[in-house]
Structures are given as C-alpha cells and as structure tokens.
Amino acid sequence: MKKKGRKSRVNNSQRMLQALDEQDLSKADQYFHKALETDSSEVLYELASYLEGIGFYPQAKEIYQNIVIEFPEVNLNLASIASEDGNVEEAFAYLEEITPKSDWYVSALALKADLYQLEGLTDVAREKLLEALNYSDDTLLVFGLAELDSELGNY
C-alpha cells in the first residue's frame, strides 16, 4: 500500500539504467549527463561500478574521475580501465595516487604486478608482489608469487 503524499524518487542514474534496459542509448546518454550533475557521489559510484561491469568504460571513467577525491580507491578502477584501453602508463599513473598509508595499497601493488607481468617485466612484478606480502598475507598474493616464481623457474 502506497502512502499518500510520498513520491518515490527515481534518480537520473536509475533512469539511465532503465533507458539502457530499453536499448535507448540516446536517452541513456541524456540521463547519464544529468546524473553527473544531480546524483550523489554514492549513487554515481554504484552507477560507475555497474557501467564498468557491462563494458561502458568511457562513462564509468568519467564518473570515477568526478568522484576520485571522495573515493580515492576508484584509482584502482581507473587503472583497470586504462589498462583495458591499452594505456599502461596512464594505468600506472592512477596506481601511483594510492599511497602506502591507504587501505587500497595492497590492491594497487597487486594490480601493478599484473601490469608489469603483462609488459614482460616478470622480475618487477615479483618485487611488487613481495612488497604487497609485507602488508598482507592474502593467499591470492602467495599464489600469484608462486605462479611468477614458476614462470621465472624459481623453484
């Protein structure tokens, strides 16, 4: 039962997603730009994550760049998008924004290791994983290091 006098507020991010669902890209683009102007940073963060997940990288990137001051961890997302676009230097630049004092530093080191490995710099990738292990004993880091050691012939 609906309460009288209360309107359900649909934000522009939701309208954009509805337009995408209806395959109306023109309308989705209009709502996207309205969302950038009117929706909260939290709502935009959710929208960007969703858009990144479905491959709308330019839109996700634009949102992340607008909210990076409030949510510095989106530098990880920006780095991933840059890497997907083949802009490895740009990806590294985003990762450099994440300092050792950040809760996201280990993730940044792991992503750097991935990027170095993709660039064929396996020794540097290994160094980044070893550095990450100084901050965390996450089993994925241990596995990644074992994988690199195997690739390097370090048994």
Q: What kind of feature is each model-predicted range?
A:
Residues 21, 53-54, 84-85, 118-119, ...:
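Register position in tetratricopeptide repeats
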Residues 10, 42, 73-76, 107, ...:
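Start-of-helix register in tetratricopeptide repeats
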Residues 38-40, 69-72, 103, 136-137:
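Short coil turns that delineate tetratricopeptide repeat
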